[in-house]
Amino acid sequence: MTLNDLSNFLQRNRKKILLATLIIFTGGGLLLFWQSSQKNKEPGPADDEGEIPTFSFAGDTWKISGQLNLGKLAETSLPQETVVYKVSEQKESITEPQAQDIAERFDFDREPTNRVFLPDGEKMFVFAQDEVNMAVFSYPREIRYSFKNVVAKTKNVSGKIYNQSTAIQKAREYLESKNLPTANIVFFDTRYLIYDVEAVAQTQNPKSANALELSFVRAIVGQNILGKTISEPLVRVVFNRTGTVVSLSYKETDQTFTQFKIISLLSFTEATASLKENGLVISMLPTEAAKERFIEADDLTSFTPQTISLVYYQVPGTEFLIPIYLSEGKGTLDAGEVYANVALSAIKP
């Protein structure tokens, strides 16, 4: 796909803009399990009188159709109540001169390779060099930087993957070197990845990994705030074995939060009892054992959660930030084993 092709595509279909960008950046390697998280569904239900909306999730979701195994999930202390927040956002856009300044910080020429005109008067500024591409979105403000062939830049290099503490420090240093603010973000998660020609797999063995992904989010009263999807946090940095940043996504937000209502939460026992019936599988990646197979996302035939945590999430199409439980663990499909994330509304009926 050429940049002109991309321009035409984006003008026709704004909802798939991040997917199209991802195609340019990675050659499609991440699409197998991430493309569904890039699609935006219709806005979730929101009450005209300001009532708390029903939990829904952006992008495709799946269910746990088979067995739920709780043997590896330790009982977790969860709060009995929390606050639902209303979100206010002041719209700020990145201008072309600002996009050019950002490009210079990443050692690109100031002149964009292409300008893509988006609906509502917004733009995407594309910068390209021999090995790397970058897209700067005017609004919502976002930077996406990546090597054109991430697989080659990870699979064909040698070295030792950073440990988590070193990686967090290096990620912050990298962002600060590009003059990207880090004061309002907190570390969220680490994933050891195996980039291969066919797909991206996840592993718990750092020695098997050829890339390390770190994600950062905003937090409120100590609780993390997810983005619209679990695979699209506020900041995502991917290192290869040599410590080179091979992929970066960085979003800026101008949100403020005001307390709306104190609500009661499901207990640990109530949450686990409800997980199979009401949980939504929101992301999955093949395990190392399944990385050679073509796995199409589908309902899980089994799920073994290993952790459960309370996080916040803004329901699509609403101004409400609500609490949800996020469970992480291993699941199975007919085609193989995956690492999966399952979201469940934390609000007690």
Give, region by region, the residue ranges found by the protein language model.
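Short, low-complexity, Pro/Ser/Thr/Gly-rich segments in the mature regions of secreted, periplasmic
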Residues: G331, G336-P349
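Segments that shape or occlude catalytic/ligand-binding pockets
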Residues: T154-N163, A167-Y325, G329, L333-G336
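Preferential activation on post-signal-peptide N-terminal prodomains/segments
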Residues: M1-F216, I220-G227, K251-F260
